[in-house]
A protein has these predicted regions:
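Glycine-rich, flexible loop/turn motifs
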Residues: 10, 55, 67, 74, ...
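Alpha-helical protein-protein interaction elements
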Residues: 50-51, 70, 189-191
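Amphipathic alpha-helical
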Residues: 65-86
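Dual-mode signal for accessory low-complexity, basic/Gly-rich regions
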Residues: 25, 81-262
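Internal alpha/beta scaffold segment
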Residues: 1-62, 66, 126
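Aspartyl protease catalytic domain
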Residues: 48, 61, 78, 90-92
């Protein structure tokens, strides 16, 4: 707390193996250093860097669009686009049953779990299904039939959703930005299957000429997930588990920033 300025920084790790508390502590210290002073945020359309902690906001929309049940209901914008380019060519999304913290040998219908590539280099390969959805689609089950609770029938659900990382570190990605915002923590829900969203930036920073110059406050980011990820600038190499989603940091364009200056 600094006067009437409240700063909240949170971080953590989800791992199947050993944790690295030093890594988490160093990230928190870095964010504290970046937040030493408040700066005026940019307005209009600027590149947005979502850290690995915040990037699952984007991937939740893709997860919904890949759901075979949404395809059957005609809600997915990708319903009739198998084999087509649906996003940036650098994006590959898969499910790995043995890789993450939510690993399982089979789903709630007894179907063995398997490695699946849903999007490869931007091309839509497959939707995930349970037995009922797979039969109706004519594709068969992918082993993704899970019960939300004991009183419910199985429904398609993803687990260990993996976004293939890129090559740049967070520092290298920051260096390539001329004027941008880093979004590290957000307030508000996800985008949903439509892809449209407007979120408050709980913790964000401004980048000028490759350097983080300070913390931005009273700022919102709005736009569409599908549009933004088609205009992907870079994927980082710093993949982290955020729940059941493994994602690196992401730099996108095509989003608008709105701010209030006190």
């Amino acid at each position: 707390v600094r006067g009437d300025d409240l700063l909240n920084i949170s971080d953590g790790q989800i791992q199947r193996n050993s944790l690295d508390p030093r890594k988490v502590a160093n990230r928190i210290l870095q964010r504290l250093d970046w937040a030493q002073k408040n700066v005026i945020p940019p307005r209009g359309r600027v590149p947005i860097l979502f850290t690995a902690k915040a990037a699952d906001l984007l991937w939740g929309t893709f997860s919904a669009a890949l759901n075979g049940k949404q395809v059957l209901e005609g809600a997915s914008p990708w319903s009739d686009r198998l084999g087509e380019v649906v996003t940036n060519e650098h994006i590959t999304i898969s499910q790995e049953p043995e890789e993450g913290p939510f690993s399982c040998p089979f789903d709630d219908e007894g179907t063995p779990a398997r490695s699946i590539v849903f999007i490869q280099n931007g091309i839509l390969q497959l939707f995930y299904t349970d037995r009922t959805t797979g039969r109706l689609l004519g594709s068969g089950t992918t082993g993704n039939g899970f019960r939300p609770d004991l009183g419910s029938y199985p429904t398609p659900e993803l687990f260990n959703f993996i976004v293939q990382p890129g090559e740049r570190s967070l520092k290298e990605s920051t260096t390539m930005l001329d004027d941008a915002i880093i979004v590290d923590q957000i307030l508000g829900g996800g985008a949903g299957i439509s892809g449209d969203f407007s979120i408050n930036v709980e913790l964000g920073y401004r980048v000028r000429k490759g350097e983080v110059v300070g913390r931005v406050k009273n700022t919102m980011v709005a736009g569409n997930v599908y549009t933004a990820l088609k205009q992907l600038v870079a994927l980082g190499n710093d993949g982290e588990w955020n729940g059941s989603c493994y994602t690196p940091h992401v730099i996108v364009e095509g989003l608008s920033t709105i701010s209030r200056i006190d």
